[in-house]
Amino acid sequence: MKNLHSLFLASAFLAGFCGSSLAGEREGVVVSIKPLHSIVSAVMQGVGKPKLIVQGAGSEHVYSLKPSDAEAIEHAKVIFWAGPSMETFLDKPIDTLGEGAKVVALGDAKGLTKLKFREGGPFEAHDHGHGGSHEEEHDAHGSGDHDHAAEVAEEGHEHHHHGEYDLHFWLDPQNGKILAADIAKTLGESDPEHAAQYEKNAKAYGEKLDALTREVAAELKPVKDKPFIVFHDAYQYFENRFGMKAAGSITVSPEKAPGAARIQQIHDKIKSLGATCVFSEPQFEPKLVKTVVDGTKARTGVLDPLGAELKDGPDLYPQLIRNLANSLKDCLPK
C-alpha cells in the first residue's frame, strides 16, 4: 500500500514537469482557502463546484499538501489563491503541478483596497518572511511521514518573502464584492459558454455584500472605539471598513511563538489601555492568549479569519463577516 502511495506521488510530481500533455485536458476549478472558495462558489452557482484545498480548521500558515490536493492542482483548469506571500505552501506545487492552468492571485485584483502591514509598538515588526525554520514548521505539522507533494510545497517555504501589503484582504466585504467580479471575469474567459451566468451571480453576490456591509456597520457602532488585542494582526481590513481599531497583536505570524518580552509588552499594553478583550483564533492553541490576560481584567474571545467551523460554500463568506462582528460585539463593552 505504501509503495502504491509513493508511486502515485511520484507520478503526480513528474506530471507537473511534463505539463498538461501527459495529464490530459485540464478541467475544474481549485481554490486555496475557505473564504476565497466561498466567493468562487457563489460565482459558480448553477454551473459547478470548485475544489477547496485547505479544509476544516486548517490554516494556510502551516498546511501540508495532501496527495488529493496535488491531483486536483495537476488537473485544474483554473486555480485561485490569495498569492505567494500568503499560501507559501502552494507556491512550488503551482509552479510544477499547476503548469498549464490559469493561475489567479486574487491579491492582485484591480480595485482592491490594499493596506500595508502595521509595524512597531503594539504590532510586532514583520520580518517580511513567515518566520520559523523548516524544522520548526515540520514539528508544527506533527510527526509522521511527509508526502512528496508536501515536500515540494515546503521546499521554498522558508525562503519566500512577504510583500509590503497585508494579504488578509477578504476581511473587507467590499473587497469581497470586487473579488466576485474579478472571479466572474476569469471564469468567463475560461468558460465562455457560462460567462453570462458567472457575471449574473457576481452581481447578485455583490449586492448581498453591500447589504451585509451596512448591516455590520450598524451592529458595530456601539463598540467602535473600544480597544482590543488580537492573536495575530490579520484583521485590519475589517477594522478599516467598520471603524474598529485593534490596540495590538500578540504575534506577527501564527506559527511563530512570541518571546517572554513580547508577551510582557502586550500584557502591559492591556493594562495601560484598559483593553477589555483579547481574541484568540480557532486554528491555534489559545494558551498564549490565556497567559497574556492573566492578572488583567480583560476577557477572552475568538475571531476566526477563515471560517474554520463553517460549512464550505457560498454562504460561508457572509457568515464569516457576521461572526467577526458578533464576536467583537459580544466581548467588548457597550
From Swiss-Prot:
GO biological process: zinc ion transport
Domain of life, per lineage: Bacteria
Keywords noted in UniProt: Disulfide bond, Ion transport, Metal-binding, Periplasm, Signal, Transport, Virulence, Zinc, Zinc transport
An annotated Gene Ontology molecular function: metal ion binding
Residues spanning the signal sequence: 1-23
Keyword Lipid biosynthesis in record: no
Disordered: annotated span: 120-147
Compartmental location: Periplasm
The keyword Signal is assigned to this record: yes
Pfam families xrefs: ZnuA
Disruption phenotype: Mutant strain (znuA delection) is attenuated in infected mice, showing decreased splenic CFU. Also confers a protective efficacy similar to that of RB51 and S19 vaccine strains.
Positions bound to Zn(2+): E60, H61, H168, H232
Disulfide-linked positions: C277-C331
Reported function: Part of the ATP-binding cassette (ABC) transport system ZnuABC involved in zinc import. Binds zinc with high affinity and specificity and delivers it to the membrane permease for translocation into the cytoplasm. Required for survival and normal growth under low Zn (2+) concentrations. Also required for virulence and intracellular growth in macrophages.
Family: Belongs to the bacterial solute-binding protein 9 family.
Protein name according to UniProt: High-affinity zinc uptake system protein ZnuA
Organism listed in the record: Brucella abortus (strain 2308)
